[in-house]
Amino acid sequence: MAAPRRGRGSSTVLSSVPLQMLFYLSGTYYALYFLATLLMITYKSQVFSYPHRYLVLDLALLFLMGILEAVRLYLGTRGNLTEAERPLAASLALTAGTALLSAHFLLWQALVLWADWALSATLLALHGLEAVLQVVAIAAFTR
């Protein structure tokens, strides 16, 4: 994946194109995930007897996840494009946190619809792929 740069030095480009593509795909998918999950929480609170304290908890966790996801994608993109290990490592740590929150929406909600399951499982798969590529990119940057 490293291509020689033209110009003054003989340095190589170490940024991961597949990782950058996954960051872009994950950002787009998360925007849809956020809206769909917000609508499903609203639907569950109106149609089913969804406990109020769980409704507040799920909404708070969804908005926390949105903030963490935005920071994660920013740090990951910045670390990948500048070939810096620290922002990419911070993004990797935030990936673990957002994966845990995604697992909450997949397994531990008071009421999990099949659409919740499908959306959260897809998001977890994206996070898993990104984590693997982030580890590979960090290893390439530290050589």
Curated annotation (Swiss-Prot):
Keywords: Cell projection, Membrane, Transmembrane, Transmembrane helix. One of its GO terms (biological process) is non-motile cilium assembly. It comes from the Eukaryota. Pfam families: Transmemb_17. It is a multi-pass membrane protein. Disulfide bonds: none annotated. The keyword NADP does not apply. The keyword Membrane applies. The chain crosses the membrane at residues 21-41, 55-75, 99-119, 121-141. It is found in: Membrane; Cell projection, Cilium. One of its GO terms (cellular component) is ciliary transition zone. Its main location: membrane. This is Transmembrane protein 80. It comes from Homo sapiens (Human).
